[in-house]
Amino acid sequence: MTTSPRALLLDVDGTLVDSTYVHVWTWHRALAEAGAPVPFVEVHHRIGKDGSTLVGELLDIAGVDDDEDRDRVAGRAKDLHSEYYAEAGDSLRLLPGARELVRGAKEQGWVTVLATSAPPSEFAEARELLDVDDAVDAVTTGEDVDTAKPDPTIVAIALERSGVDAADAVMVGDATWDAVAATKLGIRSVAVRTGGIGDAELREAGFSDIVDDAAGVLDLLSSGRL
């Protein structure tokens, strides 16, 4: 008797790579320099969300109302964020158990997909750091979609590339938007705490399980709880 293959759809930023607070800092700095200062907490709770949506919401908070001003400030902030994030590349590190999770899942027969909507340049840094291409079956990047999470399209593409049905897939992420997107597609989702979001928010977003980090996800896999 053969069993159907299962797919592990892995968010990257904040889940496998310790980049959440790098994004918080660089967006915060970029918005302030572009003329739209906002509190750090407002940036943090939007990390992982589609970039244009993130910026639009933060411009609302900053009180930038004029359409022409919004376009100018948004464009400048996005350019600065890309610049500052690239400068911070040397500070990126893997999160606990990241590489082991990808390799362990593959060894256990899972189809593994790096399901990110990061720009290709940012993903390339993370991919090099992870060094698990031989254990990855498919990837996505921001080039695959017009709008990122919580819009489910990027997760739908990751699922399609896995060749597995939604009922046999699990999404792993650190942000509420990962669960929102997965739930829309009928995909179970598991949260890691490495993005700095509290358990109550993660549960409310729809995550079925919450663990400390990628190592905890591997424990779930190895014990048959996923």
Model-derived regions, located:
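N-terminal helical cap/lid subdomain that shapes the substrate entry/recognition surface
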Residues: 2-103, 107-110
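Bulky hydrophobic/aromatic packing residues
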Residues: 27, 91, 110-114, 126, ...
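Residue-level marker of regulatory loop/turn positions in helix-turn-helix DNA-binding domains and
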Residues: 94, 115, 147
